[in-house]
């Protein structure tokens, strides 16, 4: 398979320095231009300041890129024909030399293949509301269960059924570690009514858990990192707006891949931009923690 590494990432992997994988759908589908470029470059710099190397993963003209130069991020952010790429899409996107923004599951898949054990994102996908009828369950959860990658996130997106998402993760053997929290963060909000599997208190503790688990068995780990309080939105406030967005999606017949981008856009409108700022801040926070964990894991190896 043709995978191109940036010089920075190639050197880091060769010398076993800490690397943090980053998805690209947050650039291609998650935020408007030029906010997406600004956020992506800031995330990379946050990771570098913590002593790790950022590796944004994307598909450009049918070639998987692990690590992007600044001009490549800028070009990717402006493209209109980018395919949201999870495991099922790789064959089509690669064979037809298309452009792809890798989802959480797509990024986990590539990270595992190239040996990057830490990945930072905003929030994971999960079990959609009404999944008992629609069977709409994100590929993220299955990919996490089979690949040795730690995903640092602010929990699952609040547009999902958080309770069922946790149940599914338990079935798949994926632990959800709360970073200095007993409760699952709810993306825009720092807490929810749901409990995490274990509360952990430091990057070194997380790194030790990664090492111990993967010495014994395979499978991903979620580090649920709450959005800093000063940037978080009230749980009931954001939940109310999400419910309104979900009802509107039903009216407009939105389904499948289009659901998440539609709902995030609608929530942005309903919260008058507050959700976008919260989204950016939680991604920054996750990048910082992921880099700290990657540094500790590199020491323990």
From Swiss-Prot:
Active-site residues annotated for this sequence: 23 (proton donor), 157 (nucleophile)
InterPro entries according to UniProt: Indigdn_synthA-like, PsuG
Binding site for substrate: 84, 104, 138-140
Matching Gene3D superfamilies: Indigoidine synthase domain (3.40.1790.10)
Cofactor(s) needed by this chain: Mn(2+)
E.C. designation(s): 4.2.1.70
Subunit field text: Homotrimer.
Protein's job: Catalyzes the reversible cleavage of pseudouridine 5'-phosphate (PsiMP) to ribose 5-phosphate and uracil. Functions biologically in the cleavage direction, as part of a pseudouridine degradation pathway.
Record's protein name: Pseudouridine-5'-phosphate glycosidase
Classification of source organism: Bacteria, Bacillati, Mycoplasmatota, Mycoplasmoidales, Metamycoplasmataceae
């Amino acid at each position: 398979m043709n995978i191109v590494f940036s010089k920075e990432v190639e050197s880091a992997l060769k010398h076993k320095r800490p690397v943090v994988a980053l998805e690209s759908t947050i650039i291609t589908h998650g935020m408007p231009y030029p906010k997406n470029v600004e956020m992506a470059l800031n995330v990379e710099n946050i990771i570098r300041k913590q002593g790790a190397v950022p590796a944004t993963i994307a598909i450009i003209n049918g070639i998987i890129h692990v690590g992007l130069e600044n001009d490549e991020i800028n070009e990717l952010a402006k493209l209109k024909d980018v395919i949201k790429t999870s495991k099922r899409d790789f064959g089509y996107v690669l064979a037809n030399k298309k452009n792809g923004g890798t989802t959480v599951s797509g990024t986990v898949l590539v990270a595992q293949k190239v040996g990057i054990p830490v990945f930072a994102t905003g929030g994971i996908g999960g079990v959609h509301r009404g999944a008992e009828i629609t069977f709409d369950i994100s590929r993220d959860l299955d990919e996490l269960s089979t690949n040795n990658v730690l995903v640092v996130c602010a929990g699952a997106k609040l547009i999902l059924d958080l309770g069922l998402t946790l149940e599914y993760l338990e079935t798949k053997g994926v632990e959800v570690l709360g970073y200095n929290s007993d409760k699952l963060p709810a993306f825009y909000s720092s807490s929810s009514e749901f409990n995490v599997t274990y509360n952990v208190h430091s990057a070194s503790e997380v790194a030790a858990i990664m090492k111990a688990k993967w010495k014994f068995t395979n499978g991903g780990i979620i580090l649920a990192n709450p959005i800093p309080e000063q940037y978080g939105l009230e749980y009931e406030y954001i939940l109310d707006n999400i419910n309104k967005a979900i009802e509107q999606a039903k009216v407009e017949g939105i389904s499948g891949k289009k659901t998440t981008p539609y709902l995030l856009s609608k929530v942005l409108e309903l919260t008058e931009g507050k959700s976008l700022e919260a989204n950016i801040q939680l991604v920054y926070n996750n990048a910082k923690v992921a880099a700290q964990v990657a540094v500790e894991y590199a020491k323990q190896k």
